[in-house]
From Swiss-Prot:
<comment type="function">
    <text>Digests double-stranded RNA formed within single-strand substrates, but not RNA-DNA hybrids. Involved in the processing of rRNA precursors, viral transcripts, some mRNAs and at least 1 tRNA (metY, a minor form of tRNA-init-Met). Cleaves the 30S primary rRNA transcript to yield the immediate precursors to the 16S and 23S rRNAs; cleavage can occur in assembled 30S, 50S and even 70S subunits and is influenced by the presence of ribosomal proteins.</text>
</comment>
<keyword id="KW-0694">RNA-binding</keyword>
<dbReference type="GO" id="GO:0019843">
    <property type="term" value="F:rRNA binding"/>
</dbReference>
<keyword id="KW-0698">rRNA processing</keyword>
<dbReference type="GO" id="GO:0004525">
    <property type="term" value="F:ribonuclease III activity"/>
</dbReference>
<keyword id="KW-0699">rRNA-binding</keyword>
<keyword id="KW-0963">Cytoplasm</keyword>
<feature type="binding site">
    <location>
        <position position="41"/>
    </location>
    <ligand>
        <name>Mg(2+)</name>
    </ligand>
</feature>
<keyword id="KW-0547">Nucleotide-binding</keyword>
<feature type="active site">
    <location>
        <position position="45"/>
    </location>
</feature>
<keyword id="KW-0540">Nuclease</keyword>
<dbReference type="GO" id="GO:0006396">
    <property type="term" value="P:RNA processing"/>
</dbReference>
<feature type="binding site">
    <location>
        <position position="117"/>
    </location>
    <ligand>
        <name>Mg(2+)</name>
    </ligand>
</feature>
<dbReference type="GO" id="GO:0000287">
    <property type="term" value="F:magnesium ion binding"/>
</dbReference>
<comment type="subunit">
    <text>Homodimer.</text>
</comment>
<keyword id="KW-0507">mRNA processing</keyword>
<dbReference type="InterPro" id="IPR036389">
    <property type="entry name" value="RNase_III_sf"/>
</dbReference>
Length: 226
């Protein structure tokens, strides 16, 4: 891997790996090698959830469990992680197999999000929980400062449904139009038809549910509710 690109990535992350092989593994998609990042992703997912839950618990002492769960879901969902990945310019650092490279895998939100979680897992193994917690809180500082409890933290499908029901309009319909990839690494494309929009909106994700949520979020943006 290009040392200049890797050094730039570590500067953007705010962390330099002591064991560079952990960084390489975190950046390796399963399409590229048998030593890929999925186990690190599993670890990082749990660490991220803990760090964000702990931060919300102490920031919002009077907020109930439901609102805290919704805020956490907003902060750890795939498109938020993909936003972080783009801020880190992570796409050009990924190690992908030929098929994923050809299909633009370095832009896929699910791959970008999974890689951020793998990096978290890698940093934890390379250091300790205190270091990775400090790093995550630094990445999330602005988002944690801006987030607040309330209806906006409901997931996009729920908000879209409530908006339409409140206006006595038909509920949205979701249609799977494409499924790409092998069983262990699929990408779903969903068309969502919404009353008031002339064309269906499109969402993609690593599961049908995630793709539907992404489509609903696009619909909310087109309805200028996001």
């Amino acid at each position: 891997m290009n040392p200049i690109v890797i050094n730039r990535l570590q500067r953007k992350l705010g962390y330099t790996f002591n064991h560079q092989e952990l960084l390489q593994q975190a950046l390796t998609h399963r399409s590229a090698s048998s030593k890929h990042n999925e186990r690190l992703e599993f670890l990082g997912d749990s660490i991220l959830s803990y760090v964000i839950a702990n931060a919300l618990y102490h920031r919002f002492p009077r907020v109930d469990e439901g609102d805290m769960s919704r805020m956490r879901a907003t902060l750890v969902r795939g498109n938020t992680l993909a936003e972080l990945a783009r801020e880190f310019e992570l796409g050009e650092c990924l190690r992908l197999g030929p098929g994923e490279l050809k299909s633009g895998g370095f832009r896929r939100e699910s791959i970008l999000a999974d890689t951020v979680e793998a990096l978290i897992g890698g940093v934890f193994l390379d250091s300790d929980i205190q270091t990775v917690e400090k790093l995550i809180l630094n990445w999330y500082q602005t988002r944690l400062d801006e987030i607040s409890p309330g209806d906006k933290q409901k997931d996009p499908k729920t908000r879209l449904q409530e908006y339409l029901q409140g206006r006595h309009l038909p509920l949205p319909t979701y249609l799977v139009v494409q499924v790409r990839g092998e069983a262990h690494d699929q990408e779903f494309t969903i068309h969502c038809q919404v009353s008031g929009l002339s064309e269906p909106v499109v969402g993609t994700g690593s599961s049908r549910r995630k793709a539907e949520q992404a489509a609903a979020e696009q619909a909310l943006k087109k309805l200028e509710l996001e």
